[in-house]
Amino acid sequence: FDDVFFKCIDEKLSGERHRSKYRFRVYNNDFDNIKFEIKIKNNSVSYKKTFLIQKELLNQIIDNYNFSLSDITDKDLKKELIYLKHSNYKPKSIINYERDAFKISNNFFRITFDKNITREISNKDFFNISTQKQKIFFDNKVVMEVKFRNYIPTYIINIFSKYNIARSAISKYVLANKFRDFSNDRDIISETF
């Protein structure tokens, strides 16, 4: 989700130190467990607010926020949805990928590998994944994300050093929109595979 000016993309690309990104997420096409996530970045610290929502509510949000606030009991969720509605946030991209995740037990540390990252080209229906997809990377790159709370274990740092793995900022959302003509919100390239 983004506003008409693509504020989330603009803030990411300009390196805004305090920013938020809004998304709805499902795993393995399980639409009974939809997550509304707000990814918040404050300087170098990132964290998420997560709300579980029903499919009906997401449909109402997509349908121009056609829901009753009195039906939403969670005060924090209500506050966030009011912000999205008043800021005119709309669905902009549907991004699909396969994820392998690994974590160290009893340590707030995990590594994920996202591959086969694609975006929907013409489909705006969140619940009906189309076959018209566009690869984000044309050379089958994999995105590795390292997530940790306080520190990265020393042996992991040693592995990163051995293979010259350097930190870089990547956004699947920004990459998914690299072919979009933002002047009138249309795709420049609609090459499918």
Can you say where each PLM-predicted feature lies in the sequence?
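Phosphate-end processing signature that detects enzymes handling 5′-triphosphorylated RNA
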Residues: F1-F193
